[in-house]
Regions:
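Bulky hydrophobic segments
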Residues: 1-137
Length: 137
């Protein structure tokens, strides 16, 4: 299990970074006047997070094939890959909203933020599939 996490170093770092940033108080910024800036931020943050996960999944798959841990003929694109690259980021976004609602006094959980997280993950799906197929080759 631990050796697999080493292949997903950037994803682990991003997970910890997103968790910390989402639980800290929000500083005032001139961008507060931009309508829906919070939702745009969630879409970009989780879209980027999911896309990095797609890239690291492809690189992990490629190294597994090269090391002989996985046969080349097996389908590399399957349900478990979608569960990892789509399911986990959406679940993580929901978990963050629950943590914001229950553990912080400076933040509040918001269903629209969760929806924005999911939209970001779906946008990453559109970019992630071709990226995955390119990197696995």
């Amino acid at each position: 299990m631990l050796h697999r996490l080493l292949h997903f170093r950037l994803t682990v770092l991003l997970t910890l970074g997103i968790l910390v940033v989402c639980l800290l108080p929000v500083p005032e910024t001139p961008l507060e006047n931009v309508r829906f800036i919070d939702k745009y931020t969630h879409i970009l943050l989780f879209g980027g997070y999911a896309w990095v996960l797609w890239c690291e999944s492809a690189l992990y798959r490629r190294s597994a094939v090269r090391e002989g841990r996985v046969e080349t003929g097996r389908r590399s694109f399957n349900r478990s890959l979608l569960l990892l690259t789509v399911g986990w980021p959406v679940l993580f976004g929901g978990l963050i909203e629950v943590l914001q609602a229950t553990l912080t006094t400076c933040r509040s959980g918001d269903w629209l933020d969760f929806l924005a997280d999911a939209f970001g993950v779906l946008f990453a799906l559109a970019a992630g599939i071709p990226t995955y197929r390119f990197l696995v080759r």
